[in-house]
């Protein structure tokens, strides 16, 4: 696992952040899930796979899986929520999530089938195949794919998108269209549904790459969400956008407004230095070629200066 993946997993695993993602994505910002009501689950998923005619046990690892309690109208409801972190499009994500969820459901069936060995003879006969009794229910499983990227999520979000276009409609109609939930920053219409630094992440990644430095500076200069950002979130923003902002070590919170100003000033200073060096080289070339009379014009006229750069091979 890369450093960036490790940072994102640690960030999302935090109960406060995890609850915020669940409330923001599933409940549109309503605070129905509390951090203290989350319970870490084993994220190892085991399944069988045929390899060269041999049945082998395979393991897959979710990024994060937690048991979630939903508190509503004095009632508690339960669900399992997994979060998968992605920094790039994964075109097989639908199949991967479908496998994870299916394994979780089968684990529940296996657990329930072993739960009550004292069931009546009638119950044992009626459930002898699966061990799963009539009337029993499963805890819902939801997987949220959190995309830490500056572009649009371009991968399929449903099983039908993975199937050939040439399939007859009659066949497609018989195949359940398994869909996944993707949190993509550029698609977040209302960042206020998030109450933690996840909001700053969605805003920053929606602006994009370091090439959009002026937009990024404007965002962070004017948005109070960036006055105090979780240092892990700041690190994620910095890595994904490749901005090169200096994140102070051993600080829980980072003032990204100040950090981006320093970053912007350094870029300007670097650009000025490079520009001065380049122009000095141009002046030298113009003098050597007997074109010194146009030096002042090159200094005053940006269009003419660009022509001179091109003429003397500095473009």
Regions found by a protein language model. Give the residues of each.
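Elongated, amphipathic alpha-helical interaction scaffolds
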Residues: 1-315
